[in-house]
Amino acid sequence: MENFQFEDLSPNKVSKVYQDLKKFGSFLYNHKMGVFLVSFSSGVAYLYHNITQSHKRKQIKLAKERVMTYFESTQKLSEREVDAIITKFIDENKILDKIQTPSLASIRSEKDPSEKLKLTDQLKVSIITKLFSVLYIIPMVTIFNRLQINLIGKYCYLDYVLYKDQEQHSMRLINQQTESNFINSRNNCYFFKDINFSQFINLIQEQIKISLKDWKIDQQSSFEGFLKLLINIRNNFEKKEIIASISSDNSLLKYLIPTEEEIDNLVQSQKTPENDNDIEYQNLKMLYNEIRNIFESQKFYDVLKDSINQSFLEFTKNLREDFESTELKKQIDSIVLPDLPIEMEIPKPLVTMHNIILLPKINKQIGNIIVNKKSIIEKIGSTDLINQLNYSVLTNDLDFNKVQF
């Protein structure tokens, strides 16, 4: 445009431009229907594209809502089932009674010094073993049941939820018998089988014997000192290379999952002439292999650590009250509070406690944890970490934009 000159518009050139415009006008006039149809078709195509995209966005939004509704309802179902499982095996079946605990009365009445020492050692080991067993059982069973339910959801129900189509629902990849064998319930819980649970208890107990070797029953403990003891014991179980590797002899998670031989025995016991159960065996094996792979992931380890922390936090919060001194609190309040410019609450000071007094208080707290287990299960289930992991398991990290509606 910078080099444009008016003198370039000679009469001949102006005439040529005029003739070209006239021809173009004639073309539009002679082909007005075609031009109209092309314009109309383009408009229809654009409108159709917008409508279909809008429809797809709506379908995606509805599908996401259906999946989320299904997910939230099944997580609540899992919470209720875990509560029922633990209630049955710990409250009703008294499975923790496998950990024999001598009474204080029997210790006091024992005359033989060596026997008395043996009983006191057994007392401290058994109570701390019970404590760790309960504080590990609640998060482990909670997380494991969630994984089971969401794996079954992925293979059996997700398509139906996505498409809301009964035909899709009937094409489940895993049958009801396999689902029943796979998911732990109050009537079928592999973890709480006698031999299995006894091995779980023994693993904890042996480590606690070592950790409590220098923790004498006639000594005193502070609240902070006891917390350090708990942390030291936990470190023996909760390092990633130990707990997340079920091939490790010290992994607590391996007691949640049957071995391949045990899966085979289970399937063989249900074999009938009409069904040789080979497919069920392969499906069960596939599901448990997925669980093993999840166990070894960093995401799962983060969820497990966070869930165990929730469990121990509930215990230590309540135990702290046993170390609080009301009398010292009154003395401090009478000195400090009158001089404060605003009202505030001073934390109660903590005292030390003889371990022989502390142990029965811990035993009582174990009972309180079992009674209030539902609260711990709900706290674990409400964390972002566990919900993100399980939503990922259910949907297999599905890209909703690629779903064909």
Curated annotation (Swiss-Prot):
GO terms for cellular component: peroxisomal membrane; peroxisome. The chain crosses the membrane at residues 27-49, 125-144. It is a multi-pass membrane protein. Keywords: Coiled coil, Membrane, Peroxisome, Peroxisome biogenesis, Transmembrane, Transmembrane helix. One of its GO terms (biological process) is protein import into peroxisome membrane. Residues 50-124 are peroxisomal. Belongs to the peroxin-3 family. Involved in peroxisome biosynthesis. This is Peroxisome biogenesis factor 3. It comes from Dictyostelium discoideum (Social amoeba). The gene is pex3.
